[in-house]
From Swiss-Prot:
Pathway: Protein modification; protein ubiquitination
Record field: compositional bias (Basic and acidic residues): 171-194
Protein name as annotated: Ubiquitin-conjugating enzyme E2 S
Source organism: Drosophila persimilis
Pfam families: UQ_con (PF00179)
Described function: Catalyzes the covalent attachment of ubiquitin to other proteins. Acts as an essential factor of the anaphase promoting complex/cyclosome (APC/C), a cell cycle-regulated ubiquitin ligase that controls progression through mitosis. Acts by specifically elongating polyubiquitin chains initiated by the E2 enzyme vih/UbcH10 on APC/C substrates, enhancing the degradation of APC/C substrates by the proteasome and promoting mitotic exit.
């Protein structure tokens, strides 16, 4: 998914070079559980895949996120969005992410890697006091088991590898070789059957909520 509006022409050549350099470094040496998806024709369209951290309701998921750079970047922070549907206190219905790093704590030298790591940390430690999703924030504080079940259900429905179009962020490769393509059809059929069964189970769970 590419951005509808690009600010690439409004960024200075120095900023564009810096962003591309950082993205290429992350592609070569990715942070654990994070894979950047480089759009070389538009560096203002930054997307990445984040593995759901172990021990959280998001653990089985892979989440696609997007950063949108403004014309004043890096003096002003980018906006960050989850493109994958997620039940989380700090993620609005449109996917916008609320985190202090992208607001009052922003510093021009933080960089793209720091932002993505902060988003991953938000999956581990949500901040219900500054909730964009008030239902999720209230549920986390008052009925954590229900919150965890709801977040896990959303993860299992919306954040599976097939939804992102690739494998896990820690395993995904840029070069899908013949073996990958050969088995893609079979894998998709198995995943579709698994998802169909999972959706039926989740519908039954929702009726009881």
């Amino acid at each position: 998914m590419s951005s509808q509006y690009s600010n690439v022409e409004n960024l200075s050549p120095q900023t564009i070079r810096q962003v591309m350099r950082e993205l290429q470094e992350m592609e070569t040496t990715p942070p654990e559980g994070i894979k950047v998806l480089i759009n070389e024709s538009d560096v203002t369209d930054i997307q990445a895949l984040i593995d759901g951290p172990a021990g959280t309701p998001y653990a089985v998921g892979i989440f696609r996120v997007k950063l949108t750079l403004s014309k004043d970047f890096p003096q002003t922070p980018p906006k960050a969005y989850f493109l994958t549907k997620i039940f989380h206190p700090n993620v609005a219905g449109n996917g916008e992410i609320c985190v202090n790093t992208l607001k009052k704590d922003w510093k021009p030298d933080l960089g793209i890697k720091h932002i993505l790591l902060t988003i991953k940390c938000l999956l581990i430690v949500p901040n219900p006091e500054s909730a964009l999703n008030e239902e999720a924030g209230k549920m986390l504080l008052e009925r954590y088991d229900d919150y965890s079940q709801r977040a896990r259900m959303m993860t299992e429905i919306h954040a599976q590898p097939a939804k992102c179009g690739v494998g896990a962020a820690s395993d995904a490769k840029d070069d899908d070789g013949p073996s990958t393509k050969k088995h893609a059809g079979l894998d998709k059929k198995l995943q579709d059957k698994k998802k169909e069964k999972l959706l039926k189970e989740k519908k039954r769970m929702l009726k009881r909520l």
